[in-house]
Amino acid sequence: MSQLSKKPSKQPLNQSLNQPEPPQQPSSKPSVGEFIKHEWRLLLVAVQFLTRLPVPQFANYNPQWLHQSSRHFPGVGLLVGLLCAGVFWLGSILFTPLVAAVISTAFGIKLTGAFHEDGLADSCDGLGGGLTRERTLEIMKDSRLGTYGVLGLVSALLIKISLLASMPLSVAIVALIIGHTASRLLCISLLTLLPYGGEIEHAKAKPMAQQLTPFQGLLSSAWLLLAGVLVVLLFPATVQQIGIWQWLLALLLGIVATDYMRRLLHRRLEGYTGDGLGATQQLSEIAIYIGLAASIPLI
């Protein structure tokens, strides 16, 4: 693998994620108030893990919360999508759609610390340059960026920016909100569909190397439902303008991209990795944009 540049070593976004695990408390059925409080705390953990946004420090942090917080990753996607959509709208007032798309994409990268983009680049390097499972995992752990990673990352950014710039303003805003939310839901579906395929002792987030439960999957889906309700309330004309067939196409393409990554990771690594999840998020987000940007002739 041709080594082009060095990336900074991957460190936890907040050192509070490394605090020792407190003694376990006796299990008991929580009240509604306790349940809501716990889910809110998990949402903040998810925000802390996936973004650079400041969140309150946690007393008696439990590492298991990180795994549990994965059900709120689509909620973080909704937050990121809303913020990126706002930046795109502001940019479109002052600049051309292309410049607005560039600014919005750069803002999203800054907001998330290139978390998913890094996974895409590492996956391209590993899956492109590794002939065996062991060699692929070794390349993916390498902090240096190779040719496959550069080409994959640049291609993804160019496609994403071009698609957003080609859409009408309101459609691009809706696409950002739905795309960021749905892609993270599709991404974490691999936690249920695949076992962990990396070396558990080298996992970037060891508590994440576990499968989602059906209940967690249901809570994750609720975030996409909330995103859908928001865009219907805020942009009813745009939702109608896009049309049912185009919505179905976007959803289908997102599922196809996710299933492609599922098959690829299962064949090459016998399961998912953190980098593989990041690549899945990026590819499914782009696939959704393709569906919403496509011109479907009326039959």
Model features per residue range: what roles?
Residues 118:
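Glycine/small-residue-rich loop that forms an oxyanion/phosphate-binding "nest" at active or ligand-binding sites
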Residues 2-113, 131, 142-299:
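Hydrophobic alpha-helical transmembrane segments
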